[in-house]
């Protein structure tokens, strides 16, 4: 368009101009065609390559789709499994929480039970200590009671021995009274006054024997010469040797034993005086007026000497025996 307004000086110049322009456009056309062919060839190659790539991409896409479908199926399966596991885990967690709550409650109960057991154990230990103390006290009292029983048994044995001795002395006194009565029947004494004096002396000795106060064992007199059984002393030593008695109980027991021994000694002295009385009256028997007096006694019932001596001795002996029995009973109860 720019060339249309151009002016040429000649036609040849214009023809050359147009020839050159035609050649230029022709060259451009050839170049353009060549470029077109190259572009077409490149396009075909590129198209083939694109088709190949497209096929590959489609194949890959199909593979990916199948893989995607498989993965989706797996995802669904995994989701289902996850839901199942989640629900199962939730149930397990709920069960574990319930178990934990129960365990905590059981733990609290066990702790409370342990505290109660500890308190009960403390109470039992205190009760055990109290029981042990009471048992020791009971054993001590039992041992004391056993010792007292042993001491009382020894005293009972001694009482029986003393009663046997008293009975023996009573038998001897009765025999002596019978012998004295026989001798008085056979012979009448010269002077009846000594007999009355001896009877009164015997009665006084018996009354003194019954009224002797309790004195300590250190003041006993004739008890050392009595035939006291050794078993009582051994029993007394054995009973008081393990656990000593209190001083008051020991002094009381010794006083009672000393009094009993003095009473027995007095009874033996009384019997000895009766024997001496019989032996003193035996050489002084006469036959004259004494026989008449004795017959008068048998007839009239006077018999003053024998009535004053023999019944009086029997009465004193019985009184001494009763007092001895009461004293032994009091000693047993006091010990």
Curated annotation (Swiss-Prot):
Its cellular-component GO annotations read: centrosome; cleavage furrow; cytoplasmic vesicle membrane; cytosol; kinesin complex; kinetochore; membrane; microtubule
Q: What InterPro entries does this protein map onto?
A: NUDE, NUDE_dom
Q: Where is this region: Interaction with CENPF?
A: 167-290
Phenotype upon changing residue 106 to D: Loss of interaction with RAB9A. Decreased enrichment to RAB9A-associated intracellular vesicles
Please list the disulfide bridges: none
Disordered: where is this region? 181-246, 279-335
- Listed Low complexity bias regions: 325-335
GO biological process: one example: centrosome localization
What are the protein's GO molecular function terms?
identical protein binding; microtubule binding; protein domain specific binding
- Stretches assigned to coiled coil: 18-188
Spell out where lipidation (S-palmitoyl cysteine) occurs.
274
Listed result of changing residue 228 to V: Retained on spindle poles during mitosis, no loss of phosphorylation in vivo and increased ZNF365-binding
Where's it found, cell-wise?
Answer: Cytoplasm, Cytoskeleton; Cytoplasm, Cytoskeleton, Microtubule organizing center, Centrosome; Chromosome, Centromere, Kinetochore; Cytoplasm, Cytoskeleton, Spindle
Q: Where is the signal peptide?
A: none
Region entry Self-association, spans: 1-93
Question: What's the impact of mutating residue 243 to V?
Answer: Retained on spindle poles during mitosis, no loss of phosphorylation in vivo and increased ZNF365-binding
What is this protein's tissue specificity according to the annotation? Expressed in the neuroepithelium throughout the developing brain, including the cerebral cortex and cerebellum.
Compositional bias segments (type: Basic and acidic residues): 296-305
Q: Which residues carry this modification: Phosphoserine?
A: 211, 231, 239, 282, 309
Query: Outcome of mutating residue 191 to V, per the record?
Result: Retained on spindle poles during mitosis, no loss of phosphorylation in vivo and increased ZNF365-binding
Q: Family assignment? A: Belongs to the nudE family.
Subunit details for this protein? Homodimer. Interacts with CNTRL, LIS1, dynein, SLMAP and TCP1. Interacts with CENPF, dynactin, tubulin gamma, PAFAH1B1, PCM1 and PCNT. Interacts with ZNF365. Interacts with GTP-bound RAB9A and RAB9B; the interaction leads to RAB9-dynein motor tethering. Interacts (via C-terminus) with MCRS1 (via C-terminus); phosphorylation of NDE1 inhibits the interaction.
Its function, per the record, reads: Required for centrosome duplication and formation and function of the mitotic spindle. Essential for the development of the cerebral cortex. May regulate the production of neurons by controlling the orientation of the mitotic spindle during division of cortical neuronal progenitors of the proliferative ventricular zone of the brain. Orientation of the division plane perpendicular to the layers of the cortex gives rise to two proliferative neuronal progenitors whereas parallel orientation of the division plane yields one proliferative neuronal progenitor and a postmitotic neuron.
Please give the name of this protein.
Nuclear distribution protein nudE homolog 1
What gene does the UniProt entry assign to this protein? Answer: NDE1
């Amino acid at each position: 368009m720019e060339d249309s307004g151009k002016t040429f000086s000649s036609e040849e110049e214009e023809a050359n101009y147009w020839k050159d322009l035609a050649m230029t456009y022709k060259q451009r056309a050839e170049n353009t065609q060549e470029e077109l062919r190259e572009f077409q060839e490149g396009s075909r190659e590129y198209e083939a390559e694109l088709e190949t790539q497209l096929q590959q991409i489609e194949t890959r896409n199909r593979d990916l789709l199948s893989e995607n479908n498989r993965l989706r199926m797996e995802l669904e399966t995994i989701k289902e499994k996850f839901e199942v596991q989640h629900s199962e885990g939730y149930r397990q967690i709920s069960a574990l929480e319930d178990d934990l709550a129960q365990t905590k409650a059981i733990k609290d109960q066990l702790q409370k039970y342990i505290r109660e057991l500890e308190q009960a154990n403390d109470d039992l230990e205190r009760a055990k200590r109290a029981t042990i103390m009471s048992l020791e006290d009971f054993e001590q009292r039992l041992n004391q009671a056993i010792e007292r029983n042993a001491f009382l048994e020894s005293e009972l044995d001694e009482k029986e021995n003393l009663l046997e001795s008293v009975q023996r002395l009573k038998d001897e006194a009765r025999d002596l009274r019978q012998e004295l009565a026989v001798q008085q029947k056979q012979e009448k004494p010269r002077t009846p006054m000594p007999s009355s004096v001896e009877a009164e002396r015997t009665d006084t000795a018996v009354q003194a024997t019954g009224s002797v106060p309790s004195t300590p064992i250190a003041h006993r007199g004739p008890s050392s010469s009595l035939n006291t059984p050794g078993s009582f002393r051994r029993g007394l030593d054995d009973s008081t040797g393990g656990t000593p008695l209190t001083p008051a109980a020991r002094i009381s027991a010794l006083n009672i034993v000393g009094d009993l021994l003095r009473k027995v000694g007095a009874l033996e002295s009384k019997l000895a005086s009766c024997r001496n009385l019989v032996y003193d009256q035996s050489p002084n028997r006469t036959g004259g007026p004494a026989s008449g007096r004795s017959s008068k006694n048998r007839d009239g019932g006077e018999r003053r000497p024998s009535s004053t001596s023999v019944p009086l001795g029997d009465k004193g002996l019985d009184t001494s025996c009763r007092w001895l029995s009461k004293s032994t009973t009091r000693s047993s109860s006091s010990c």
